[in-house]
Amino acid sequence: MRILKLLELVVKVSLFTIALSSVLLAFLIFRATDAKVEIIRGDHPEIYDDSAENEVPTAASIQREAILETLTNLMLESRTPGTRQIREEKSTIPISAEPTTQKTISVLDLPNNCLNASSLKCEIKGISTYNVYYQVENNGVIYSCVSDSAEGLEKCDNSLNLPKRFSKVPVIPITKLDKKRHFSVGGKFFISESLTQDNYPITYNSYPTNGTVSLQTVKLSGDCKITKSNFANPYTVSITSPEKIMGYLIKKPGENVEHKVISFSGSASITFTEEMLDGEHNLLCGDKSAKIPKTNKRVRDCIIKYSKSIYKQTACINFSWIRLILIALLIYFPIRWLVNKTTKPLFLWYDLMGLITYPVLLLINCLWKYFPLKCSNCGNLCIVTHECTKVCICNKSKASKEHSSECPILSKEADHDYNKHKWTSMEWFHLIVNTKLSLSLLKFVTEILIGLVILSQMPMSMAQTTQCLSGCFYVPGCPFLVTSKFEKCSEKDQCYCNVKEDKIIESIFGTNIVIEGPNDCIENQNCIARPSIDNLIKCRLGCEYLDLFRNKPLYNGFSDYTGSSLGLTSVGLYEAKRLRNGIIDSYNRQGKISGMVAGDSLNKNETSIPENILPRQSLIFDSVVDGKYRYMIEQSLLGGGGTIFMLNDKTSETAKKFVIYIKSVGIHYEVSEKYTTAPIQSTHTDFYSTCTGNCDTCRKNQALTGFQDFCVTPTSYWGCEEAWCFAINEGATCGFCRNIYDMDKSYRIYSVLKSTIVADVCISGILGGQCSRITEEVPYENTLFQADIQADLHNDGITIGELIAHGPDSHIYSGNIANLNDPVKMFGHPQLTHDGVPIFTKKTLEGDDMSWDCAAIGKKSVTIKTCGYDTYRFRSGLEQISDIPVSFKDFSSFFLAKSFSLGKLKMVVDLPSDLFKVAPKKPSITSTSLNCNGCLLCGQGLSCLLEFFSDLTFSTAISIDACSLSTYQLAVKKGSNKYNITMFCSANPDKKKMTLYPEGNPDISVEVLVNNVIVEEPENIIDQNDEYAHEEQQYNSDSSAWGFWDYIKSPFNFIASYFGSFFDTIRVVLLIAFIFLVTYFCSILTSICKGYVKNESYKSRSKIEDDDEPEIKAPMLMKDTMTRRRPPMDFSHLV
């Protein structure tokens, strides 16, 4: 008994000792650590212990040393024995004035958990075209990382779609939505180092920093030169770059080409396929962009092979039609003869074809009796003659009216014998397959199959294609294959520069050369520069660049990149290199750099007025006012329309040409920008947990940020305790969340303030060549004509005050869109600035926005369901207004072209009557000036301004050697004259003379000297001296289908000219009426001729002799004319 009591006492003492030890240990632990910090990237907690024994840097600072090409980040590790720093304080500890108190280490010496992802637990959070965003966990701490390499991430969660490697071509972000569809080559994660409260620690490659992550659309960047070439088969151009690696691709605006970028080093050759020559594709190479000219490969090949021979070119170009004609001849003669002769021997083939096509044959035969043009006797097809063939539809031997009742297909009797059988019976099958209609159809199918077999064996083109060497491409103009490599950047300094007050001393390493010169640095640069490289930067580039150099390091210097094609300054070049490094410092500067475009890819094909497709109309003056002929012109306000007017008062020898061309018509909208919205790609969460206290206690260590904050209390109770925390109904978890936005899919929301109809109208002819913008608000007026718009906006889909969205595809969308600062559940949330900073969101998260979890033994966790408002998914309810992409001007207005009529364009033209009279004497032309600028042998030509004074009013023809002109006739008035003329010259017209022929009279001609010509040869793909391009353009103009159509309608110009704006419509109506009239008369003539032949009326009748004149031997009357001596002829068959 005593032993049992002794054992009981020992157990109680042991339990008491264990309990006391636990309490003491917990007290000691609580003194050492007050709480835990958990940071979540997405759904994963990241834990920092704020204990004195286990320190983790709560702040970082970067100290930069002076080096030549790149700068190294240094992090300071600061010890904080107290609690965690408040969020509103600086996220980095300021550098102390005493360098001896700092502990400075290299970033490369710090343990980088992002680089050890293969041996740690990691998860892929996002994959872009050029890098990856992921998180790794080490000792309960989760680190957020962005890397340009996929090495070591194969074992991470969500790595199924992770590529083996990312492209290394340099890219920079695009912020302007209208540039995305032209230059977008994918997306990339960038770090924005802005001085805002929403920053958090992030590591890019191996460089730690504080900022926010966003997914941006990117474009290519770099120095690239496109080598000109004669654009002929095999349609190859060459590109070169001095950089170590460069990217290029061929892109059609709006096309998704994020994985089609091709990298090269040094030089590369590009061969264009036929689909790339449609005039819509662009060649993008680094900063350069070039429009691939529209080229009809088939036409160009024929023109090159049969140059200077228009007949051979026509035969080669139209060879596809010749092939069809040949096949048609083969089908209708030998193949048809062969099919007809083998019908019976090949009965098995026709039975098989009939079995395959039986449903079609059955349907055609059953519907035949309802066909309006069938023969009334036997059912054959009858369109013109209304006569039947000898064999009817049921293969009767002769045609007769009784066949209709005998043939089951044409019979309408319900009790026919065949109605007893099913449609699928053998009786019906034999009947259907053996009808005349079915046999004719099966024969036709057989002929087509034989023709297709023969067609496939014929050559596709008469023009031979040139083959390239195996594995190489020929570069036109170069006799060799160029594979030169450029020198790489040096790994260490090669020179030394010492800037003094009065001189500069330069020393070249490895030599004994020392150069001394005067101090010619930039003036008024007041900043401290101690190291040698700082002095050099201050001297040559200024203090602004030195500030970037010190505070914004370049991890990759890109020393070969000059940015010359964009015209970047030294500061702009440095910022562009920072963007290449994946760092965004300022969205305003970024937008400026990404908005720069080098090349002609955005240039529209500004061709001259297409006179070959415009209708021609003779125009009569309406009245005479003050000695001037007044012409009243009215046209439909539709883009691409126009008219060529021929003016003549019946006194002048030649008509005067006056052309009106409406180049484009649309609506100019003035808008007010509201906000930007984008989808949420991931969420960053930062929270802090306490064992005791409430939200106020928690906020002492985790301060409020102002938006998207949350707090959960109580968090400590039975069953929800961390180790050594025995509080009941105590504790709190507080923090905030920040979203990572996919700016690649962002929409910008605008409010429409005003709409105005705008038309670009080009005038050519006797008034010279000029294009003017006319609006509905302000009529256009000059000395010779007036123009105004009669607006009609009832078809416009955008109303004033409506909210519209400008999408990443540059299209305009409308629908239910949330207004600014409106939490309604419509498309438009989150509401952001251009750089992805929220401007309207939830101040405090609610219970439905997150979930909180804990365990009896373990850490607490917070999962964010929705960080703020998110209605981006409602974008599917938006409606695209137009298929035409638009570009905004300073985010305040845009122009949207319309494909329908917006009203009427009314013009009043007053021309002096002297223009239509022969000049009485040679005019006196003084103060002449003719200046031109542009390119030779190109689509744009030379834009010239002709100015002079005249003492007479007259009409004149103009010409100049080796040049074609946009207009060959001018209306000259008395006094000052000014004309815009476009010249297309094969040689430089500088110092040549333009000749004016008043009223076409060479005896009183006047010469004007070309004063100045500025030739600006653009760097693009096609060479400006491409003679084949000129021949192709000439051929297309001469053989245009529109030109042929206008030629057919031209006989009706005079009548149609009296109907004003209905000119072209009347011409078409008259042409159709003329065709019907001719067809009707031809039908009557055919019927008369057929009756004449059928009745043998052409045979001679016996002659009739007159008793009174027996001496007359020649027959005067024919037998068929003696209608009184024979019964009347039956002409019922002609009806």
Swiss-Prot record:
The record marks S484, K485 as: Cleavage. A motif (Cell attachment site) lies at residues 41-43. Residues 177-195 are annotated as: Non-covalent dimerization. This is Envelopment polyprotein. Keywords: Disulfide bond, Fusion of virus membrane with host endosomal membrane, Fusion of virus membrane with host membrane, Glycoprotein, Host endoplasmic reticulum, Host Golgi apparatus, Host membrane, Host-virus interaction, Membrane, Signal, Transmembrane, Transmembrane helix, Viral attachment to host cell, Viral penetration into host cytoplasm, Virion, Virus entry into host cell. GO terms for biological process: fusion of virus membrane with host endosome membrane; symbiont entry into host cell; symbiont-mediated perturbation of host process; virion attachment to host cell. The chain crosses the membrane at residues 315-366, 1068-1088. Residues 36-314, 485-1067 are lumenal. It comes from the Viruses. Residues 437-484 are annotated as: Signal for signal peptide peptidase. Residues 1-35 form the signal peptide. The cell attachment site present in these glycoproteins may help in the adhesion of virus to cells. Belongs to the tospovirus envelope glycoprotein family. Glycans are attached at N116, N210, N605, N980. GO terms for cellular component: host cell endoplasmic reticulum membrane; host cell Golgi membrane; membrane; virion membrane. The gene is GP. Tospoviruses are transmitted from plant to plant by thrips as the insect vector. Residues 367-484, 1089-1135 are cytoplasmic. Disulfide bonds join C114-C145, C122-C156, C224-C285. It comes from Tomato spotted wilt virus (strain Brazilian Br-01).
